[in-house]
Amino acid sequence: MNVLLSPQPLFFPHQHEPSRRSPPRTMSHYTMTSRKRKADDDDNEMSVSPTGSPAINPRQLSRPSKKVRAGIELAGRPLPLPRLLETLDKTQLRAVLQTICERHPDIGHEVMTSAPRPSVNGALEVLGEYQDKLRAAIPFGNSSSEYTYYRVKQPLMALVDALGDFTPQFLPPVEQQTTVSLEYLNHATKIIHDLPDFDSQQYRHHKDGAYDEISRAWALVITEAAKRGGGFHLHNGKWDQVLAKHNQQSGGKLEQAMNAMVNEVGWIGANQNAHGQGSSSDPNSILNQLINGTYGAPVQVGPF
């Protein structure tokens, strides 16, 4: 049997042998341009994730929904209560609150029990406002007592009435601290000193009445202080000297307060004199003069 053999032996490439490279081919400019555009298109397509890709979809942020009142047209309406109160000044707010308390006594009682007690500085601030109004009403130049009185009558009466309302607030038993009571009385007496003096006696009754009321207030505080602490802090605080100066400036219209100081605190100096210590290091102190009854007497000067 004849077997036809090929003139060249058969050659089988090895499995791991790299394939032979084909000879290079020359490409036209048109072919290269079209392939470049196709590659760019492929890149653009790959940059966009397909809808069916398993990539995580971006979370869509929900916008806050606006409260829309369906079926209600925009129309004017009054301010809410908090906004309305913001527009009121102190005077207007006080007037509104006072009107409500007068119409509803139970609300007024609740306000009085809930509001904090006024301090001395707070009371003096209010009294200072009344005092400023009084000073602004005083006419310039030399005016007659009658004209001046009717110019200042309204603010004068308002200030005197305010003094009459504030003074009991700082007296015992409402005020338990003697120092607070004396501090208020000291400043209140100074305010009374600054009230206008009129030539006619018929126009002086406001100031005279204020002196009488403040004198009785001094006497009450001095008496209660003597009961609690024996009056030592009155003497140590030199309130006897303060009161004596007020009495002198008022023209002796604080006589009731001066008598209370002598009767309630005078025994301190008497006891100290009995032990040979003296009521004060200064024999000419006002307290010693009050005790000895020599206050206001002429003082001798020179070697007599």
Swiss-Prot record:
Give start-end positions of Polar residues composition bias: 46-63
Location relative to the cell: Cytoplasm; Nucleus
Q: Where is this region: Disordered?
A: 1-66
Q: Which UniProt keywords apply?
A: Cytoplasm, Nucleus, Protein transport, Transport
Per the record, the similarity remark reads: Belongs to the cut8/STS1 family.
Q: What does the UniProt record say this protein does?
A: Involved in ubiquitin-mediated protein degradation. Regulatory factor in the ubiquitin/proteasome pathway that controls the turnover of proteasome substrates. Targets proteasomes to the nucleus and facilitates the degradation of nuclear proteins.
* Name of the protein in question: Tethering factor for nuclear proteasome STS1
From the UniProt record, report the name of the gene that encodes this protein. STS1
